[in-house]
């Protein structure tokens, strides 16, 4: 049987297939592997790539996989509606990362996942990332008597060819000089 006759698209990078295996993979005792819930039913959302104007704005390279936050939220809504229709509990697994945003839980997507996680029978699982030690983030805190802090930003040669995006997050009264 051709598995691709059952679905309208293919997972070309393997990330979704890998996550599905972690979530509900069959037990392979000889390889010491079992998915978290091997008997689970899966409902999968295939996200479309981010629109060109957003990729251009954020200088996202053509070969980089990127999605839009609003599409992710619509996918979550679809899963919620599907779980309701079948009267099933739902675990929403998001294995999508970003280096953008404040990471404070205040983005629209963060709010949606937090809200759905408050419903009975729904759990949200969000990957913590796999870029430890790559120095994509800097956090600093200033005391009242600190007037400035120099922070060096190193941009790789390839990234610098097109430009780069830098986000600065602070309280409203703070000032930055760049």
Regions found by a protein language model. Give the residues of each.
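Subtilisin-like serine protease catalytic core
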Residues: 1-68, 87-88, 121, 161-162, ...
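Short beta-strands within extracellular/lumenal beta-sheet-rich domains
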Residues: 4, 145-153
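Generic recognition of flexible, low-complexity loop/linker segments
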Residues: 7-9, 30-33, 82, 112-113, ...
